Amino acid sequence: MSEQIHNPASEKEKGRVPQYLIISILTIFGIGSQYFSNLSYILNQTVIQNGLHISSNNLLMPSTLSNLAFAFGVPLGPVLTKKLGLKKNYLFFVLIFLFGSIISAVSPEIITLTAGRIIQGFSAGILFLTILPLSLISFPNKIRNTFLFMIITGLFGATALGALFGSVSLTIDSWRWLFYLNGFAAVLCLVIGFYALPKNKKQDNKKADKTGLFLYSLLMIVLAFPLCNLTQKGFTSIYIWPFLVAAALLLVLFIYVDLKAEKPLVPFRSLKAAKPFSGTVMAIASHLALVIAIAGINGFLRNNLDLPFVYITYFWLWFFAGIVVTAVLKTLLYDKLGAGVLGFIGSLAVIYVSAEWRVMGPETSLALLYFQVACLGAGISMVLVGGALGTALAGDIHQASMRSVTLHSIRNFAGAVISPFIGWFLMKQNAVNYEGIRESLSQDDSEFKLQIMKLVQHFIGEGLPLTTAKNMASYELVANAKRSAVLGAYHQLFTILLVISVIMLIASIGKMVTGKGRSLVQKQTRVLLPAPKEKDLKNSVS
């Protein structure tokens, strides 16, 4: 990027706020608002469902389409920034995000809520690579490592705060105020950005590949229908698999076209070297791990532990605490150890958590869960940010933006696609597990009768009559079977998380092997003047 950043020293002389702090605020509130909305929506779906009087199946549509819209907008950000200029592009799409937030906040039905979430997702996707690269280069060289603290606590922190505020919305049984918070953040960005963003000229020398843009747009449209209906209809439905096959063909064609294009929308060729490739795998795998972990642990807390909402709030506070720890460690150690070593450490933390969660039960202590979710937040953020930054700084620095566009486009696309698959997987495994439990009980009549007898005696001991005790025993047995079935589904999901965390570990090792890479804080080389000749010294003394 060639935007002019004001010299921090000159700003200090004028008594102004340093430019890097202003850009950081615009980055956190401009992009983080979408992450905040995503996580708060996941947690407070019950409140929204009751408020809009809709079925649980309809609740998946706003989040699925919002994620797709965000993924669609990510590679368009740099294209529109070059065409419109950074300031105009940023302010325009922040305004669009504000409109989306207002529509979501006042939505009387699921259709308008979905429209608002799509607008939010698309505009935030555009903003992502509009402001994020500027944020990095706005930091002065000597403190550029503090960019890591800003990006981790700001963007990952927005994710954690979204989960935290989503828990609060469950407690107070209200959800619209969360979108008003999004609107407030957008207004703040509009005011600050209008006065503080540097004015820059358009840089549109060559137009982006129109064929690639058309194929990418068509891919998102084709994917929208099956992803919104996958959980309800399943893979075998005629409404699902033909669309997924068509989407797969479009994806292959899009990659082929972009590889051949002179000005590709997503420059896949920029990742062909080993060093950026390993960093990309780190970032993508850790992003998928985050999506899977949040879906699994949120379901476990609600369905198997049945915690009061206040304890769920504490849970996500510990998640945020782990993120803050990583932010500090990354800031202090990134230039010394590199992305590979830190990613290795973070991967081990995620492996530990996933191994524990795949065998945990309702008897698990809250204190242990708090510690484990802190490890999860610390580990995933360490791997993801290290992989993303390590990819950008791997190789020719003039192609850093191209590598970032490719990495973040793939990462967000994969995250948008996997979420509906997680819902389908959990529903399918839950049904399979439940049927297996029912068959095992019906095949072994003696065990079934023994369990019923124990439960009947338990309820009679509590003072219930025999008929009521038998009914309660049957109900309790079915409820226990359902809880066991859904717990088994979460265990299987956490097994997938374990596999992905191992991939994160292998990619981190690959990053270590290929070298630490460029440091954030560059050492300043002093220019030494030649020593004066002895004769000149004598003359100057005399």
Segment roles from a protein language model:
Residues 66-73, 123, 154-158, 322-323, ...:
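MFS transmembrane alpha-helix packing/gate-lining sites
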Residues 18-74, 112, 294-298:
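Extracytoplasmic
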Residues 416-513, 518-542:
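Hydrophobic transmembrane architecture of multi-pass small-molecule transporters
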Residues 20-35, 42-43, 263-431:
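12-transmembrane solute porter fold
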Residues 171-282, 286:
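Hydrophobic transmembrane-helix bundles of small-molecule transporters
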Residues 48-50, 80-81, 113, 165-174, ...:
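Interfacial helix-cap and linker-helix signal at transmembrane-aqueous boundaries
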Residues 74-212:
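Helix-loop-helix hairpins in multi-pass membrane proteins, especially solute transporters
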Residues 64-79, 128-132, 317-329:
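Central cavity-lining transmembrane alpha-helices of secondary-active solute carriers
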